[in-house]
Amino acid sequence: MSPQTETKASVGFKAGVKDYKLTYYTPDYETKDTDILAAFRVTPQPGVPPEEAGAAVAAESSTGTWTTVWTDGLTSLDRYKGRCYHIEPVAGEENQYIAYVAYPLDLFEEGSVTNMFTSIVGNVFGFKALRALRLEDLRIPPAYSKTFQGPPHGIQVERDKLNKYGRPLLGCTIKPKLGLSAKNYGRAVYECLRGGLDFTKDDENVNSQPFMRWRDRFLFCAEAIYKAQAETGEIKGHYLNATAGTCEEMIKRAVFARELGVPIVMHDYLTGGFTANTSLAHYCRDNGLLLHIHRAMHAVIDRQKNHGIHFRVLAKALRMSGGDHIHAGTVVGKLEGEREITLGFVDLLRDDFIEKDRSRGIYFTQDWVSLPGVLPVASGGIHVWHMPALTEIFGDDSVLQFGGGTLGHPWGNAPGAVANRVALEACVQARNEGRDLAREGNEIIREACKWSPELAAACEVWKEIKFEFEAMDTL
């Protein structure tokens, strides 16, 4: 390179490393309506100031790299860079801060959750200046959410398809989750649906194993659905898990489900990936299929309080990517779910407009505009004694899913389903009459036992079962 060229190239450019906060910490910045906003829980390494840590997150998740590069002069960093615009300490925690970062909308591909996460959480979590990092919340502006189809159908369309109103929907995961033949699996599906459930479900790891290939399972489950519908006069469904090793195979399974005329399929959206999930959601809308979403692997990402991604972010991402149901914890069962936090992201799934509410872990006001809502699914260690609490906590727009709480009934699968349906109907009737489910729940269930021997037997079996552990994820 000639001296003249060197001079031209170096005008306005100084090589070397400089503090991130000089460029990416901008406390005077006023956020725009079109910005994607993020709240990160930051734990800096000893000796790293919180402003530098927050700026590093903004830089490494947007335009920055570890050193100054001369190609910065070929673009407008002020237009494209992420900005850490506010930092606050976390109450009760030592050396933890909430860093608020604003990202310009032009950094993200339209309609792509994959691209959004690749930018915001793709690389920065391994950054050495940080001891730990957790994405607590995202504000998705309408300008971005409108580029997504979202759920294939949404809550109201699902109710219209099923012709079921005024109560939560009832489901059951077929157990044992692995090992049944397709014919025996279909038998269990029929018995549960015939007993009064609305849905049965493939477990998340039921795909196409040697003991039960997917096509055989789909056929026997479809037979069970049609037989139960004919005998009950109600529309029934089974979540046929279309999750597969390739997107092509996944769509092939969904196509076969549509050809069978069943109402709903299922996908494991985290293990399957957002690209696959969005593709399946588009297929489901185009072909009239409901889409049930399982969150297998979520606790690997969201359970640690100071590192990872909070489930409220994964829930928002699912609403954008597409799904009509998603598992959302129970508050009362065997799986993690602190009440106020759970209700916070349940509202983020169902409602059109959600106000900022730090008491429920909601860091930003979220306006979904016209994006359809998602039904939260309560599943995991629940039984008939939990029915009043579940009905009170989740309300009508939910799916209450009892696996062992149906199939573990001492008289069999169908009586287990009867017990759950009777308990639910009793709780809904009591609520509609103005009774307090939280205070009178046990009494309501005992009253219903008098005219349902199936419910009485279930209550006797599970009267002592409790899952009482301290929640990991608290405010």
Swiss-Prot record:
Positions of post-translational N6,N6,N6-trimethyllysine modification: K14
Gene Ontology biological process terms, A to Z: photorespiration; reductive pentose-phosphate cycle
UniProt PTM: The disulfide bond which can form in the large chain dimeric partners within the hexadecamer appears to be associated with oxidative stress and protein turnover.
EC category name: lyase
Annotated propeptide span(s): 1-2
HAMAP family according to UniProt: RuBisCO_L_type1 (MF_01338)
Function noted in UniProt: RuBisCO catalyzes two reactions: the carboxylation of D-ribulose 1,5-bisphosphate, the primary event in carbon dioxide fixation, as well as the oxidative fragmentation of the pentose substrate in the photorespiration process. Both reactions occur simultaneously and in competition at the same active site.
Subunit structure: Heterohexadecamer of 8 large chains and 8 small chains; disulfide-linked. The disulfide link is formed within the large subunit homodimers.
Name used for this protein in its record: Ribulose bisphosphate carboxylase large chain
Protein species of origin: Platanus occidentalis
